Amino acid sequence: MATANSIIVLDDDDENEAAAQPGPSHPLPSTASPEAEAPSSSEPHGARGSSSSGGKKCYKLENEKLFQEFLELCKTQTADHPEVVPFLCNRQQRAHSLFLASAEFCNILSRVLSRAQSRPFKLYVYINELCTVLKGHSAKKKLNLAPVATTSNEPSGNNPPTHLSLDPTNAENTASQAPRTRGSRRQIQRLEQLLALYVAEIRRLQERELDLSELDDPDSTYLQEARLKRKLIRLFGRLCELKDCSSLTGRVIKQRIPYRGTRYPKVNRRIERLINKPGPDTFPDYGDVLRAVKKAAARHSLGLPRQQLQLMAQDAFRNVGIRLQEQRHLDLIYNFGCHLTNDYRPGVDPALSYPVLARRLRENRILALIRLDQVISFYAMLQDGGEEGKKKKRRARLHGPSSHSANPPEPSLDSGEGPIGMASQGCPSASRAETDDEDDEESDEEEEEEEEEEEEEATDFEEEEDLEQMQEGQEDDEEEEEEEEAAGKDGDGSPMSSPQISTEKNLEPGKQISRSSGEQQNKVSPLLLSEEPLAPSSIDAESNGEQPEELTLEEESPVSQLFELEIEALPLDTPSFVEMDISFFRKQSEEPFTTVLENGAGMVSSTSFNGGVSPHNWGDSGPPCKKSRKEKKQTGSGPLGNSYVERQRSVHEKNGKKICTLPSPPSPLASLAPVADSSTRVDSPSHGLVTSSLCNPSPAQLSQTPQSQPPRPSTYKTSVATQCDPEEIIVLSDSD
């Protein structure tokens, strides 16, 4: 029990001495207790405890004395800032009691005090250093509970019954704490020895010269030094854990950067947490700062617009970048070099005495800045190019399906269908980007069509001028043809031949034909059914410039001749391409009489293609009907208007019989094919007008001449030469 009491008294004395604050009355009982209890303790543990308590007591008193001297110096030097001394006292009170009574703190105080006395202008630097050390060894809140419990039991230390009641618990606590402290001391000593060994090895490696041949060697001196420094840092962190102190050494790069750049404390706190985030030393970019600002605004419902958030993030990124650059620059200045450069002083710089060296250093600095800018700009361009490439790939991925769906041929624009309508019907869930692209494509197509129409109008105007010149030059040929036809007839006095001869002459406007529409239809239909295409040999003969063979109608009745003459005298205002061929000679408003197909186009026999007859002026005819240029172009660009080449028809009589020369179309269906309706025509560039290299005008070109030539009310004259090849005209004129 005595040993237990002595152990308890010694432990209480040690704890009281460790937790005691500097004062005149408190050290008296603590100093008296070990003197009274020391003889009674005969065990080695008690003797070692008394010696350790005496050492702690000595360091504690000396540390208090040095700290008071430092405070007095601060009072005299920092009269303008009276808050410095209370701040130091507060830091000293928060520090751990074991550290305050240690030799380490004594060495730090003596060094700081001596430097502050020798260099008073750097007093705040040494104050900051001392505050950093005290903060690193500050006691935790959970550790403050033990001293409070012991101090609360101090008044009961004089009463023996209370000591007897607390003996078992205190004995167990001291028995469990004693081996733990001894084990931690061994670990601390071993780690300190390893640290000293690493420091000596690092110094030895720093003193060695680095050869250029060792740069590629994995075991070169600078790589070994870097590995040892990493191990040294890990050992130092482990040592701080065992000593229960902070690992902050006051390095500039490890200091926390406060940020107050915006008006919103929540945003400032989020940015400060970002730049002071533990872990790898990464420099935040603009995207990181912008995300932090957006998160803070969304979490705290700041209600800031997007533009203001972007401006705030830009300002914060600039300020943070400047602060981090300054921090890294100062850290490089403070930690650059090694123990070999510790003796360097600014006044002994060799560049001050050697101007060549100073100039070379300035040139190297300028070159370094230029190369740094080049590297930064190079990788900035790579980053921009990568972002642009990603955007293009994303656009291609989004617009890929839309381009494939737009491949089918476009329907007619007149019928209300187009690329937009098809896209909306085929894929109703198309995105806005796809519709925008389709709108752009449609606008481009419309512009192309307008340009093509303008070009066609220009070419049509030129062709009209050529046609006028060609018509003037062919008037003589026209007169010769009329004379040949008149001479070829033997003056037959039958009633059927007189209308045929009269139609080739100039007709008076007052003449009329008293035929009903029903009779005309019955007369036209047999002739249409009896029409047959020619043999291919006639086509070859025509291509070689020879006169085509004549088909002799041996058994032609007078009724059929009358049918033929009446068909030739019909007005040429049909919706087919015949009206487009001869419309510049005459235009009438009366609807012609031809067989009507399903699509509304007129089917006309091959005899109506010939222009050898001048049409009559009907009695009930109205003013001439004019069509617009666009409608004529659409009608003239149909399959018949582009493919059919009209031939001259000559009527002769041989041996008292009428001989009829029929045209030879390129295909049997050319004269019977219906004309496409203008409302269903595809208005695309592929259906443009086809012009010939010869002087043979196309039907669409001939259809536009009446716009510049007003209709003649009196006499109409048909020119056969304008509806055939110039070569054939020459052949026919030479046949006489």
Curated annotation (Swiss-Prot):
It is found in: Cytoplasm; Nucleus, Nucleoplasm; Nucleus, PML body; Nucleus, Nucleolus. A motif (Nuclear localization signal) lies at residues 391-395, 624-630. Residues 622-736 are annotated as: Interaction with SPOP. Residues 435-485, 547-557 have a biased composition (Acidic residues). The modification Phosphoserine is found at S25, S213, S412, S424, S494, S497, S557, S576, S664, S667, S684, S698, S733, S735. GO terms for biological process: apoptotic process; cellular response to cadmium ion; cellular response to copper ion; cellular response to diamide; cellular response to heat; cellular response to sodium arsenite; cellular response to unfolded protein; negative regulation of DNA-templated transcription. Sumoylated with SUMO1 on multiple lysine residues. Polyubiquitinated; which is promoted by CUL3 and SPOP and results in proteasomal degradation. Ubiquitinated by MDM2; inducing its degradation. Deubiquitinated by USP7; leading to stabilize it. The Sumo interaction motif mediates Sumo binding, and is required both for sumoylation and binding to sumoylated targets. This is Death domain-associated protein 6. It comes from Chlorocebus aethiops.
